[in-house]
Amino acid sequence: MLKLLSEIGPVIAFFAGFFYGGGIQHATLYMLITSVICITLCYVIDKKVSKLSIISTTVLLVSGSITLISGDSMYIKIKPTILYVIFGIIFLMSGIRKNPFIKYALESIVRLKEESWITLSYRTAAFFFFMAVVNEVVWRNCSDETWVKFKVFGVIPITFIFILLQLPLLLKNKLPDSKI
């Protein structure tokens, strides 16, 4: 539950900051503060923070700080693209190297045949590359308000749909001792 809150909390703070705090600058500040609080809580409570969370928070701190200092919202808008490309490369390379990163992230929930982990890695890489393109199209062609709404009401459902589309692979290839 803490992991979910640490992922969604900054998005909610960004949305609230944009619509109730006065625009992208406030939203960025709220998201930076919330992200630092969330990652700190994860470390204090769980005594660990995932590598993906560290990468995500680092990119956020850099792009968010540049946005706040420069006043240019482009930097916070390209943050998702940068993260999606980094994650896409991580999942793609781990699949190519036959050492699927996604296995380490999900193995406590589901146990799969090894070739299924590799397939899931490639699919996840493709999803992240797709999301990078979508983010670029939206932020470059839409208003700040539309981009913010897309981040909250578009990305979450698209991600959920992607996860649902993976269920047949997971259910077909799960090992007998799997939790799902």
From Swiss-Prot:
<feature type="transmembrane region" description="Helical">
    <location>
        <begin position="4"/>
        <end position="24"/>
    </location>
</feature>
<keyword id="KW-1003">Cell membrane</keyword>
<comment type="similarity">
    <text>Belongs to the YciB family.</text>
</comment>
<protein>
    <recommendedName>
        <fullName>Inner membrane-spanning protein YciB</fullName>
    </recommendedName>
</protein>
<comment type="function">
    <text>Plays a role in cell envelope biogenesis, maintenance of cell envelope integrity and membrane homeostasis.</text>
</comment>
<feature type="transmembrane region" description="Helical">
    <location>
        <begin position="49"/>
        <end position="69"/>
    </location>
</feature>
<keyword id="KW-0472">Membrane</keyword>
<keyword id="KW-0812">Transmembrane</keyword>
<keyword id="KW-0997">Cell inner membrane</keyword>
<dbReference type="InterPro" id="IPR006008">
    <property type="entry name" value="YciB"/>
</dbReference>
<feature type="transmembrane region" description="Helical">
    <location>
        <begin position="150"/>
        <end position="170"/>
    </location>
</feature>
<dbReference type="Pfam" id="PF04279">
    <property type="entry name" value="IspA"/>
</dbReference>
<dbReference type="GO" id="GO:0005886">
    <property type="term" value="C:plasma membrane"/>
</dbReference>
<feature type="transmembrane region" description="Helical">
    <location>
        <begin position="76"/>
        <end position="96"/>
    </location>
</feature>
<feature type="transmembrane region" description="Helical">
    <location>
        <begin position="118"/>
        <end position="138"/>
    </location>
</feature>
<feature type="transmembrane region" description="Helical">
    <location>
        <begin position="25"/>
        <end position="45"/>
    </location>
</feature>
<keyword id="KW-1133">Transmembrane helix</keyword>
